């Protein structure tokens, strides 16, 4: 038992190399103990050894016929690999063995969402929360899914019913005249009233998302590109065609105004993703940002013209708008990459020698995001529960960095939901973030 606990500890610490050695040693000594095969599957999955991991989970269920946890773990891995039908079968096996297994319902929910079956996915998330009310991951997944789909069958779930009420909220603003501060205040107060009235124990939601998106049915697969950069310090080929129009709101009120604009803004290319965020990356300057993702420098220049005309009219004549290329981290590693003040043909080009790194990583990474079976929906317009919870995190941020405009939005600080993770993350860089805001 001590050796097995040490194995768990090594895995939790991220010491996968030694965890793998210990797991293989334990299996050599105890080949018929199912839980060791199951744990070896988790380790191999963390090491991107997906086929080995599948064999481990299968061996665990072969040894122990009614091993719900191993079936669930196999389902999670198959989902990540884009093998959705097989994943569904494994989750069903786990649920048949253990009907009150919340994690399996959550996993099945994830799988159904990937297949575009949102109503069924939400039903599974709701079941997971019925079984385990403090299941944070299931709460987050359910709330996120409501950004894309309005459930009609799960009205007994307080998250669903609250989201439906928020979606019916009529906001009186348009993009032809200035959005007044009072309209932002009214929007938040009405949304907050719905939130506090309809969700019991709302202080226990623990929702840590900090970005708001409006997008069509496109996934930029940024996680893949960042993984390539983190592992090889090279930029993915896709990112050489990625340009962003960046907007820098001066305070929390202007950030919310920008979000309201993005919610209604229709650009010529429906695939342009729009995002509002608070800056939380260490050593990255700025406080509040809006981004519109474009697919060429020419398109970014055209979008900048559109945004300048609208935002100087509805938010501020002095709002800052500029064009950036790719992720900030890429430009720090390769300064020429972020240069955009020249003709597109003169910009930094992709180094074809880097392609070997991409192919190597693509062989290791799960295929879920590139599966042809995966269905991607665009976000709903109007206000969602996800939106208002993210804005609560924005207000925490504003308060901590000294942006006193947040006091216009809330009558008192008790109207802002607490977030222990936000508090922790901010404590690690508070002086830095205060400095960035005060120098803006």
Located regions from the model:
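Charge-rich, low-complexity segments
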Residues: 107, 114, 134-259, 270, ...
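Helix N-cap motif at beta-to-alpha junctions
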Residues: 251-252, 294-301
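Conserved alpha-helical positions within TPR/SEL1-like repeat arrays
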Residues: 5-12, 35-46, 69-80, 103-113, ...
């Amino acid at each position: 038992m001590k050796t097995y606990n040490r194995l768990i500890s090594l895995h939790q610490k991220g010491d996968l190399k030694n965890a793998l050695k210990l797991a293989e040693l334990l299996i050599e000594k105890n080949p018929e103990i199912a839980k060791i095969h199951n744990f070896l599957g988790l380790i191999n999955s963390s090491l991107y050894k997906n086929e080995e991991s599948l064999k481990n989970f299968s061996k665990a269920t072969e040894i122990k016929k009614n091993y719900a946890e191993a079936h669930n773990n196999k389902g999670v891995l198959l989902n990540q690999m884009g093998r959705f039908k097989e994943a569904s079968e494994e989750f069903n096996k786990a649920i048949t063995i253990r009907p009150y297994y919340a994690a399996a319902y959550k996993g099945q929910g994830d799988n159904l969402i990937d297949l575009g079956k949102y109503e069924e996915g939400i039903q599974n998330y709701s079941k997971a929360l019925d079984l385990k009310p403090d299941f944070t991951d299931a709460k987050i997944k359910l709330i996120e899914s409501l950004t894309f789909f309005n459930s009609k069958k799960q009205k007994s779930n307080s998250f669903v019913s609250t989201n439906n009420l928020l979606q019916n909220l009529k906001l009186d603003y348009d993009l032809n005249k200035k959005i007044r501060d009072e309209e932002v205040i009214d929007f938040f107060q009405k949304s907050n009233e719905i939130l506090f009235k309809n969700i019991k124990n709302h202080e226990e939601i623990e929702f840590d998302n900090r970005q708001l998106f409006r997008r069509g049915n496109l996934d930029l697969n940024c996680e893949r590109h960042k993984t390539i950069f983190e592992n090889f310090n090279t930029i993915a080929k896709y990112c050489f065609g990625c340009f962003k129009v960046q907007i820098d709101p001066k305070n929390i009120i202007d950030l919310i105004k920008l979000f309201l604009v993005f919610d209604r803004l229709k650009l010529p290319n429906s695939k342009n993703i729009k995002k509002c965020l608070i800056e939380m990356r260490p050593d990255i300057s700025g406080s509040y940002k809006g981004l519109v993702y474009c697919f060429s420098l020419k398109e970014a220049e055209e979008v900048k013209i559109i945004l300048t005309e609208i935002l100087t009219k509805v938010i501020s004549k002095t709002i800052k708008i500029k064009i950036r290329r790719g992720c900030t981290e890429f430009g720090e590693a390769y300064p020429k990459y972020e240069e955009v003040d020249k003709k597109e043909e003169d910009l930094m080009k992709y180094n074809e020698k880097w392609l070997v790194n991409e192919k190597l990583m693509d062989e290791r990474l799960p295929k879920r995001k590139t599966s042809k079976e995966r269905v991607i929906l665009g976000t709903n317009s109007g206000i969602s529960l996800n939106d208002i919870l993210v804005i609560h995190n924005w207000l925490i941020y504003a308060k901590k960095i000294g942006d006193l405009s947040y006091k216009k939005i809330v009558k008192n600080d008790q109207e802002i939901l607490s977030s222990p993770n936000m508090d922790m993350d901010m404590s690690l860089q508070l002086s830095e973030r205060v400095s960035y805001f005060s120098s803006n």
